[in-house]
């Protein structure tokens, strides 16, 4: 009886932890709308929600020690650059602490990166996109040039810290897509189409 009760408690605890945090719920409609406007009706909204989860834990006022700001943790110069790329959608002033602006800019930046990376599978390509968002497209491109197979994330990931990026940054950069695609995304499964990965 004790084992059955313990199993039930663990099952319930697991189900609760797999839910989106309360802070995320108020942004769901905005994120779905912004993602579908850029990516279409089959937009992988759970990926984007998991990305915000990883970046800021849905804190509008989040500020990193290195200067990244807001829900999507844009660095100030990246935010300004986004307004130059997409002035009609984002206006002339970067507003990283405005949640609607941050979500709108993030899905556009993700699409911009997605168009510049390769992958044999959706997982490989989104993995590369997320690594580029976290650590810079130039670093990912340098690593992919060394890789035996540019479309395979494992082949590219092996070159982290060898090609151009300092090895000290590899753990965070390689963990970033793994957490988003294999841990956090499941919390947001009800929000839309997921990108499945084997781990």
Cite the ranges covered by each PLM segment.
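Cell-wall polysaccharide-cleaving catalytic domain and substrate-binding groove, primarily
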Residues: 53-78, 136, 180
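Positively charged n-region of N-terminal signal peptides that target proteins for export
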Residues: 1-4
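Non-catalytic cell-wall polysaccharide-engagement segments
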Residues: 17-30, 39, 77-108, 112-199
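Hydrophobic h-region of N-terminal signal peptides that target proteins for export
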Residues: 7-18
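Extracytoplasmic
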Residues: 43-48, 53, 66-69, 126
């Amino acid at each position: 009886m004790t084992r059955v009760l313990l199993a039930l408690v663990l099952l319930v605890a697991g189900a609760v932890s797999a839910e989106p945090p309360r802070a995320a719920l108020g942004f769901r409609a905005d994120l779905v709308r912004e993602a579908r406007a850029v990516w279409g009706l089959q937009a992988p909204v759970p990926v984007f929600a998991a990305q915000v989860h990883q970046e800021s834990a849905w804190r509008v006022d989040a500020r990193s020690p290195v200067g990244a700001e807001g829900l999507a943790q844009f660095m100030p110069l990246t935010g300004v650059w986004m307004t130059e790329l997409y002035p009609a959608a984002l206006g002339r002033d970067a507003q990283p602490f405005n949640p609607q602006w941050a979500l709108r800019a993030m899905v556009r930046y993700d699409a911009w990166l997605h168009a510049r990376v390769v992958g044999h599978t959706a997982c490989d390509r989104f993995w590369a996109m997320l690594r580029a968002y976290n650590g810079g497209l130039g670093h990912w491109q340098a690593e992919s040039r060394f890789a035996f197979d540019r479309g395979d994330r494992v082949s590219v990931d092996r070159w982290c810290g060898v090609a151009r990026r300092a090895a000290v940054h590899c753990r965070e950069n390689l963990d970033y897509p793994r957490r988003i695609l294999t841990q956090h995304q499941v919390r947001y499964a009800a929000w839309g189409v997921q990108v499945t990965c084997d781990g």
